[in-house]
Amino acid sequence: MDILGATLRVYVDDLEKAIPFYEGLAGGRAMRSERGGVEVAAVGCFLLMSGPESQLEVLRKVAATIAVTDVEETLRAITSLGGDVIAGPVPTPAGRNLIARHPDGAIYEYVDRRA
């Protein structure tokens, strides 16, 4: 399993207002999507999220989003090391993801960029 990098999760009240700042900071354009009532904008290493508090409450439990080369390989590594998969793998607009709980209780999202 290769870890390619991590994305910082930023929860904002007003996505439209936040995007220009993060685009300027990261030097790139936001890639937008929506899932389960939560609006998402990926800008550089930032993942901006805005939506109903009931949905964000669940998302706030995820410490970070980690980019990997292959989600299936990551699933095998996590489970063989004593972690468990809470959700996924499932397709997303950017690739596939899964949510996993590490043996210490920390929860992370893992994503790959496969079509």
Where do the model's predicted regions map?
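Conserved active-site tyrosine of GNAT-family acetyltransferases
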Residues: 18-23, 78, 105
